[in-house]
């Protein structure tokens, strides 16, 4: 797994072409109308759908008011610097409603559940499950075979660029609604209890709980049984 440097991310955002993509349903005398250099138009008779940049399509609509009877615009972002990750070739299970930005690394057989938000530079290891409504901030790094519980937040660090990101090592289980703050490393095989706020590093194979989170015990057989990672959920 490769962790992106903060300055790489800053440069990527700074130099990206900002985009306001739209989908426009249009009706009228459409033959011969140029909707813009970036546009893809699917026209059938006097109706059609156009995909492209709003600045170009808006100009075409204004210049052809006499021909266009009606139109409806679908738009979900404005001057966006970072596109969404292309999911088609990711060897993972990604459920509807997950928001995953470009420049995110997702390992094979990972699971991303509904409502998860994963920011640029994040890394998700093989076989790791990111549960519903989890937030992975910029550069948050999660190892292999982890479970990040529903509603948890792994804080992001892009600025200041010198700051250390959150690192979750392999085989970690984080309970629902836990928060791991910037710069924290959670060691291999550790368990973070539900609702904990983790402000300091967590030793491997320990259990932490509370606000702020503190060690309550070492991992034992009972804890292993309660936090078992089921590979059946990760099969494609």
Swiss-Prot record:
Listed GO biological process terms: diaminopimelate biosynthetic process; lysine biosynthetic process via diaminopimelate
Keyword Signal part of the UniProt annotation: no
UniProt cross-references to InterPro entries, sorted A to Z: DapH, DapH_N, Hexapep, Hexapep_transf_CS, Trans_hexapeptide_repeat, Trimer_LpxA-like_sf
The keyword Ribonucleoprotein belongs to this UniProt entry's keyword annotation: no
Alphabetized GO MF terms: tetrahydrodipicolinate N-acetyltransferase activity
Pathway: Amino-acid biosynthesis; L-lysine biosynthesis via DAP pathway; LL-2,6-diaminopimelate from (S)-tetrahydrodipicolinate (acetylase route): step 1/3
UniProt keyword terms in alphabetical order: Acyltransferase, Amino-acid biosynthesis, Diaminopimelate biosynthesis, Lysine biosynthesis, Repeat, Transferase
Origin: domain of life: Bacteria
Reactions that this protein is recorded to catalyse: (S)-2,3,4,5-tetrahydrodipicolinate + acetyl-CoA + H2O = L-2-acetamido-6-oxoheptanedioate + CoA
PROSITE patterns, alphabetized: HEXAPEP_TRANSFERASES
Annotated EC: 2.3.1.89
Role this protein plays: Catalyzes the transfer of an acetyl group from acetyl-CoA to tetrahydrodipicolinate.
Family: Belongs to the transferase hexapeptide repeat family. DapH subfamily.
Name this protein carries in UniProt: 2,3,4,5-tetrahydropyridine-2,6-dicarboxylate N-acetyltransferase
Organism of provenance: Bacillus subtilis (strain 168)
Protein encoded by which gene: dapH
